[in-house]
Amino acid sequence: MSSETLSQELRGAPVAKAITEKLAAQVQELRAQGVTPKLVIVRIGQKSDDLTYERAAYTRAEKVGFEVETIELPEDATQEQVNVTFDQVSADALVHGCLPMRPFPAGIDEHEALQHLAPEKDVDCATDSMLLATLCGTPGALGPCTAEAVLALLDFYQVPLEGAPVAVVGRSNVIGRPVAALLSARNATVTVCHSKTKDLTATLKQAEVVVVAAGRAHLIGADYVRAGQTIIDVGINWDEAAQKLVGDVNTEQVAPLVSAYTPVPGGVGSVTTAILARHVVAAAQRTLA
């Protein structure tokens, strides 16, 4: 890429705004039919990351027009308390979606607890059944909000996916695997990379789109990319030395070399609550079907 060519910064705010405006109209239609979409957030303790995302969810809900309630359990909550909480949320006909703030504290068996959440109210792909539906490409499956935010961002900026070689760095059930499945469903040719991948540099350079969700600050630098690529950075890491949030991509190194990239913060993360809202509205719409 010549020094005269500027790479495009793919910001999340315009994507979230477009989704929010569309959802607000859908919520008005639901309210006219006597349905007010409602999300319940289940949070154990007061981790700062959880509280930050919770505030963002409330802000998005206000813009879209649906209700949110938080059930806060103490840090030392028992397994039984957590299980019963999900039972109650599942049984409440006025609740359409539930967002469990994960990971749970060490003393809680997350898998056991989430078996008590009704899959139709799972709006962030926390349950095994919703994850399976996402990985299998089942119509109507609600994938992890962050994974779907990646697709929403690529669509908004009209990044071609059909037939395109795409590399995903990371294979977690929260982002890596689901985003690979979503991309594959769009007929991209997907390679999933991880810590055991041989010659990661060569693999990534062959891709037209690279999605990085490894959870390691500045893992991907200039050596891993080439001109013409679109780089999607899903990572959110705290850089203690710089005292700021950074991604899994070293943006200073990578941005001048590629065609397009997402910033951190301000990229994928800012679309995630809009996808959460979309899922809550979709769950509410299904109650009328």
Task: Kindly give the residue locations of the regions a language model identified.
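Positively charged, low-complexity intrinsically disordered leader regions
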Residues: 1-35
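Short, well-structured alpha-helical segments in soluble
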Residues: 81-93
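Anion-binding alpha/beta catalytic cores of soluble intermediary-metabolism enzymes, centered on
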Residues: 97-161
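Short beta-strand elements in bilobed, periplasmic/extracellular small-molecule ligand-binding domains
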Residues: 61-76, 190-192
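Glycine-rich phosphate/diphosphate-binding loop of Rossmann-like nucleotide-binding domains
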Residues: 44-58, 140-230, 234, 239, ...
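Rossmann-fold NAD(P)-binding glycine/threonine-rich loop
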Residues: 111-132, 235-288
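Short glycine-rich anion-binding loops that position phosphate/pyrophosphate groups of nucleotides
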Residues: 101-107, 216-218, 236-239, 267
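N-terminal glycine-rich anion-binding loops that anchor highly charged ligand groups
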Residues: 29-39, 45-63
